[in-house]
Design a protein with these regions (language model features):
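Non-catalytic DNA-recognition/assembly elements of restriction-modification systems
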Residues: 1-36, 43-85, 207, 211, ...
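Sequence-specific dsDNA recognition surfaces
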Residues: 52, 68-91, 100-131
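A short beta-sheet element
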Residues: 103-104, 123-184, 189-203
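Short, contiguous acidic/charged loop-to-helix segments that flank catalytic cores in large enzymes
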Residues: 119-122, 151, 164-166, 212-215, ...
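Short, hydrophobic secondary-structure boundary micro-motifs
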Residues: 188, 261-262
Length: 265
């Protein structure tokens, strides 16, 4: 037991270090986003106009656009069928199976321990995840925003969250950071209802109006910000690898199947 505890403890500093680095990188990305798209620091010499939206005065060549008019695929778990058909065709497992079933709680913990079998995965074809999508919680813990990780197994979207998959790559980080920030959260609050349980639906979400800079500015921003998120993804891969290794070793150490010398060798 003491050996198992020592092994568990030895991994914790590595987890915390990578998560601290990622938190710092996210803060850098948000600071850059705020500089460009909240304070408009690179564009202060341009002419502005009053947008009659939460975004206030914006540069003349920029636009306010409803999400439904953007090149973004938006879907959720229930898009795959009725509640009855979902109950009949989807089986969840807490042991490794064909594909990950990605939930809000998993994304928060960066630990993916719910699975579906191949039949379930194929039935949930409308909400298959490729990695890199924007995921937003729309029931209960409304407004939690994530970038979907890229895992080794196939992935499918869990319930109570929606996914956004921009058809133009340069939109991804812009939209992700917009919804992570104060204005984006306020926009989500504006379409959220419910007293016993807060929630919003896809239709109302698609009606949200966003500030859209010209394409050349979005592309330039994407080129600057992408290396930051590449590093974040590298650190997440390392966390995932360490988590998998820890979860494999600990049961064997506790049962006596594996000795600490076996690991060292």
């Amino acid at each position: 037991m003491q050996t198992a505890y020592h092994t568990y403890s030895s991994y914790q500093p590595l987890f915390h270090k990578n998560r601290r680095i990622n938190d710092n990188l996210e803060q850098q990305a948000q600071a850059l986003f705020k500089s460009w798209f909240v304070d408009f620091e690179p564009f202060l010499r341009e002419e502005f106009f009053k947008s009659d939206s939460l975004f206030g005065d914006i540069p003349v060549e920029w636009h306010i656009v409803a999400i439904k008019d953007l090149s973004v695929y938006i879907t959720d778990y229930v898009a795959n069928g009725s509640f009855a058909s979902l109950r009949e065709n989807v089986r969840l497992y807490d042991k490794p199976n064909y594909a990950h079933f990605i939930r809000n709680t998993d994304l928060k913990a960066e630990s993916y321990k719910m699975y579906v079998d191949k039949h379930s995965y194929e039935f949930l074809s409308k909400s298959v995840l490729e990695g890199g999508e924007i995921i937003i919680s729309n029931v209960g813990d409304v407004g939690s925003v994530f970038l979907c990780p890229k895992l080794e197994k196939p992935m499918t979207l869990g319930n109570n969250i929606i996914l956004l998959r921009p058809k133009k790559d340069y939109l991804t980080f812009y939209l992700y950071m917009l919804f992570k920030g104060g204005i984006g959260q306020h926009l989500i609050d504006g379409v959220t209802g419910g007293s016993a349980q807060r929630k919003f639906n896809k239709t109302d979400f698609k009606s949200i109006k966003l500030m859209m800079p010209p394409v050349n500015i979005l592309i330039k921003f994407d080129r600057i910000i992408k290396p930051i998120f590449s590093k974040i993804e590298e650190n997440r891969d390392e966390i995932s690898r360490l988590t998998s290794l820890r979860d494999t070793l600990l049961p064997k150490l506790m049962s006596g199947e594996l000795k600490i010398n076996d690991i060292n060798n």
